[in-house]
C-alpha cells in the first residue's frame, strides 16, 4: 500500500509528522506538503504558474518534499510527479484545528483530500479539535502557545487505515473527514453528518484603533481603499444530535463523516 500525506499547515508542522508516524508501519509513505502555512485557502490550484519542489526532512529526519503552492498543488505534485505510481490513499493532516460543518469547503486540509478524489484517489482529511480551555499553555513570559496532543488522533487514524487496508475503501464514499478531540470523554468513533455551520464570521475596520488594538493587526500602508480584516468567533454550540459538531462538543469523541465530491442536490424535481 502506498500513501501520500499532505496538509495545509506546512511541511514542518507537527501534525504531518504525527500522521506519518501513525501509518508508517502500514504502508510506504511519501510526504509532499506546502512549504508554508496555507490554512483556509480551500481548493486553490496554481494553474500555469511556477512551482518550486524541494527535498527536505521532517523533525524525525525522515525525507519529505515541500512545494511552493497550495495544499491541492502539493497533492497534485505528489501524485503526478513525485511518486512513481499513483498512491492508493491520500491523507491530509493532521490539521492543527477543527474542520467540521459545511465550512469545510474553505479548509485547505479537506480540499487537499477533495483534490485527491478528483485524481481518482480515495482520501482522508484528519483534524485535531483543540479545546481552548485545555490546549493552550502559558510560558514563563506569560505568552500563550498551543500544546498539541496527537495521541488519540494517531491511534484513530492508524486503526482506520488498517481497516481500509484489510477491507478496502467503502463503496459510495469518496473521502472521509475525521476530527479527533484532544480533550475527550470517549475514544469511540461516531459516524456523523455535517453540521450547517461552525463559526460566525465578521469583518472589522482595521483603522479602528480600539479594534485593531484588540486584534493587533498591523496596518497595510500600501493598500488603497478600506483596510479590512476578516475574523471568526463564537464556535456554534447548538449542533443537532448525529452531527460532527455534536460528537466533538457534546459527546467529546472522534467524528467520522463520509463525503462525496459530487455536490449535486437530488431533491429538486421541478421548479
Regions found by a protein language model. Give the residues of each.
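A cross-family phosphate/adenosyl-ligand binding-site feature
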Residues: 3, 14-81, 85-86
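Short glycine-rich anion-binding loops that position phosphate/pyrophosphate groups of nucleotides
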Residues: 9, 37, 70-71, 95-98, ...
Amino acid at each position: 500500500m502506498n500513501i501520500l500525506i499532505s496538509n495545509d499547515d506546512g511541511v514542518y508542522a507537527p501534525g504531518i509528522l504525527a500522521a506519518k508516524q501513525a501509518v508508517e508501519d502500514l504502508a510506504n509513505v511519501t510526504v509532499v506538503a506546502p512549504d508554508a502555512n496555507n490554512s483556509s485557502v480551500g481548493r486553490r490550484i496554481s494553474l500555469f504558474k511556477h512551482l518550486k519542489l524541494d527535498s527536505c526532512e521532517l523533525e524525525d529526519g525522515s525525507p519529505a518534499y515541500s512545494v511552493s503552492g497550495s495544499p491541492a498543488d502539493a497533492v497534485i505534485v505528489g501524485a503526478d510527479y513525485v511518486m512513481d505510481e499513483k498512491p492508493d490513499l491520500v491523507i491530509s493532516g493532521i490539521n492543527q484545528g477543527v474542520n467540521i460543518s459545511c465550512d469545510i469547503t474553505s479548509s485547505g486540509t479537506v480540499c487537499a483530500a477533495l483534490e485527491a478524489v478528483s485524481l481518482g484517489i480515495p482520501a482522508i482529511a484528519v483534524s485535531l479539535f483543540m479545546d481552548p480551555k485545555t490546549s493552550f499553555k502559558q510560558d514563563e513570559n506569560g505568552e500563550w502557545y498551543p500544546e498539541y496532543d496527537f495521541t488519540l488522533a494517531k491511534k484513530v487514524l492508524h486503526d482506520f487505515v488498517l481497516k481500509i487496508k484489510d477491507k478496502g475503501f467503502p463503496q459510495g464514499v469518496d473521502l472521509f473527514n475525521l476530527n479527533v478531540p484532544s480533550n475527550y470523554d470517549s475514544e469511540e468513533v461516531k459516524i456523523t453528518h455535517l453540521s450547517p455551520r461552525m463559526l460566525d464570521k465578521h469583518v472589522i475596520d482595521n483603522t479602528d484603533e480600539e479594534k485593531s488594538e484588540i486584534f493587533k493587526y498591523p496596518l497595510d500602508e500600501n493598500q488603497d481603499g478600506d483596510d479590512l480584516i476578516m475574523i471568526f468567533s463564537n464556535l456554534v454550540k447548538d449542533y443537532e444530535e448525529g452531527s460532527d459538531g455534536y460528537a466533538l462538543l457534546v459527546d467529546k469523541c472522534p467524528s467520522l463523516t463520509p463525503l462525496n465530491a459530487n455536490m449535486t442536490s437530488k431533491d429538486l424535481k421541478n421548479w
